[in-house]
């Protein structure tokens, strides 16, 4: 789950991490009131969307008076912001962050992620702040400093100092401030079950202060059950509607660009299914794992989600029956196809407990369901069926 910038900064303040004074607003008049509360004679207007690249897309604007402020907020609210990280439809702008301007002398990058290889939290820092860190990693990886956190003892102050001096900084007052910031970010990361935390940029002001000018936070979805405060911050308007619907039924769904819908029980089998579709000359339209308990209700909702994608020209269902009986799965598929009213070909491969009985039920049904003879046959059949339609 992603947070908006204003929500991320709300969390940073709770951990005593310095951020500029700001207010989130939902209409132009409120923006003027926010500016009066913040003070100053110049402000930064920031569209709140779950995407990077807002500045280049016109979603971040510097305004020099309250008339410009009101005009900028009015121009952004209710629009859809298209950046390099969104699709062509963009993301809806429903709120604006009005922020105090900062006297920027230097921009740095600071971030933390979970490294899957070492299974540990890794903190990263770079002198290349204010730019896309992915490009820095691609073109100049040596400019990214890293420290790995031992989970047995946690982040240590000496590791913060390693990053500080690695950035070419020397001022002792700044070192203490930097250490406090990084240690605070570590507490935030671990206590709130984050999967990604980025401060880009972390700025040094003209007076030598360190301020987190922008913040990006991703939370581990699997931990939301114990993060009630963060769970309430979810903005479903920024998420794919199909993925939101899938989450309500505990289905793991990710939309792709192809035209062959996939429904599989098990993430590993789902990935193998997509691979085999590609090898057979087709393109998967989604990743969808119905999990171990492929009940009739969940199968029905999975079909609804798949066919709501207008690009889908055929569906491949690949089920391995371990504890679940394949004949009961077949009954659920037949019932779901009838209930949803699917008019594209459906190829089903069943393997495991009562697979032959399940395949017979599919073959004997009057529905447009093809019972495949094996994994490879299933992929070839659906690619063939979709090719005929195309």
Swiss-Prot record:
Keywords for this protein: ATP-binding, Ligase, Magnesium, Metal-binding, Nucleotide-binding, Tricarboxylic acid cycle
ATP-grasp domain segment(s): 9-245
GO biological process per UniProt: succinyl-CoA metabolic process; tricarboxylic acid cycle
Keyword Zinc: no
Cofactor (UniProt): Mg(2+)
Cross-referenced Pfam families: ATP-grasp_2, Ligase_CoA
Cofactor details (free text): Binds 1 Mg(2+) ion per subunit.
Annotated metabolic or biological route of this protein: Carbohydrate metabolism; tricarboxylic acid cycle; succinate from succinyl-CoA (ligase route): step 1/1
Gene3D superfamilies (alphabetical): ATP-grasp fold, A domain, ATP-grasp fold, B domain, Succinyl-CoA synthetase domains
Organism domain of life: Bacteria
Binding sites annotated in the UniProt record for ATP: 46, 53-55, 99, 102, 107
Family the entry assigns: Belongs to the succinate/malate CoA ligase beta subunit family.
UniProt protein name: Succinate--CoA ligase [ADP-forming] subunit beta
């Amino acid at each position: 789950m992603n947070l908006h910038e204003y929500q991320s900064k709300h969390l940073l303040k709770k951990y005593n991490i310095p951020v500029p004074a700001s207010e989130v607003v939902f209409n132009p008049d409120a923006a003027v009131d926010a500016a009066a509360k913040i003070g100053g004679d110049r402000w930064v207007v920031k569209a709140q969307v779950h995407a990077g690249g807002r500045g280049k897309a016109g979603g971040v604007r510097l305004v020099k008076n309250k008339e410009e402020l009101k005009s900028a907020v009015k121009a952004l609210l209710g629009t859809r912001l298209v950046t390099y990280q969104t699709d062509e439809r963009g993301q809806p702008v429903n709120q604006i962050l009005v922020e105090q301007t900062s006297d920027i002398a230097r921009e740095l990058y600071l971030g933390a992620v979970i490294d899957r290889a070492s299974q540990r939290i890794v903190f990263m820092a770079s002198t290349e702040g204010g730019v896309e860190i992915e490009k820095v990693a691609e073109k100049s990886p040596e400019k990214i400093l890293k420290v790995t956190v031992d989970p047995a003892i946690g982040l240590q102050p000496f590791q913060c100092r390693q990053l500080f001096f690695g950035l070419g900084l020397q001022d002792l007052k700044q070192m203490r401030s930097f250490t406090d910031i990084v240690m605070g970010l570590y507490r935030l990361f671990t206590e709130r079950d984050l999967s990604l935390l980025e401060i880009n940029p972390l700025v040094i002001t003209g007076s030598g202060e360190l301020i987190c000018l922008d913040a990006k936070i991703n939370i581990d979805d699997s931990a939301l059950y114990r993060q009630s405060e963060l769970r309430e911050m979810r903005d479903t308007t920024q998420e794919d509607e199909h993925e939101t619907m899938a989450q309500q039924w505990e289905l793991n769904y990710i939309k792709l660009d192809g035209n062959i819908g996939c429904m599989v029980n098990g993430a590993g089998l789902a990935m193998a299914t997509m691979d085999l579709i590609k090898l057979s000359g087709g393109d998967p339209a989604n990743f969808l794992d119905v999990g171990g308990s492929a009940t009739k209700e969940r199968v029905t909702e999975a079909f609804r989600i798949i066919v709501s994608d207008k690009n889908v020209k055929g569906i491949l269902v690949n089920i391995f029956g371990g504890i679940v009986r394949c004949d009961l799965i077949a009954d659920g598929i037949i019932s779901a196809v009838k209930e949803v009213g699917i008019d594209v070909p459906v190829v089903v491969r069943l393997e495991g407990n009562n697979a032959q009985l399940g395949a017979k039920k599919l073959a004997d049904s009057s529905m447009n369901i093809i019972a495949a003879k094996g994994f490879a046959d299933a992929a070839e059949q659906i690619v063939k069926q979709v090719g005929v339609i195309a």
